[in-house]
């Protein structure tokens, strides 16, 4: 049995799940009666984790956004980690959304502070886009996971490599 256990807190999302959610949204877009005859598309820029919603009506653009968010939730991606970049209008309305897939330094410091304030017998350290938490008991690590989830940060947090 290991004398120390650890896990990583990461902001990474599963890119395949994001693709699957957007594909499901496209299928629903094709089958929805209220969106028939309206030009609407969903485009994904994988390198920048940005997706673009394009629709010929601003009201339908909001419907399209709701469809995408519902599909993301069903796929286990936290919608709080999605930031609206900008809205463009012209012949078509466009909405650019960015999926945060990293923990920024401010959020990492908040998480680290919450872990230290919990007075559990664990140590945490910020390692780039991840936070490593080390402790002797798995119960303490599970308590840390619960504390971090209760922080309600606008991130897609995932807990990896529990050893």
From Swiss-Prot:
This is Nucleotide-binding protein Cla_1551. Coiled coil: none annotated. GO terms for molecular function: nucleotide binding. CDD domains: YajQ_like. Belongs to the YajQ family. Keywords: Nucleotide-binding. One of its GO terms (cellular component) is cytosol. PANTHER family: UPF0234 PROTEIN YAJQ. It comes from the Bacteria. InterPro entries: DUF520, UPF0234-like_C, UPF0234_N, YajQ-like_sf. Nucleotide-binding protein.
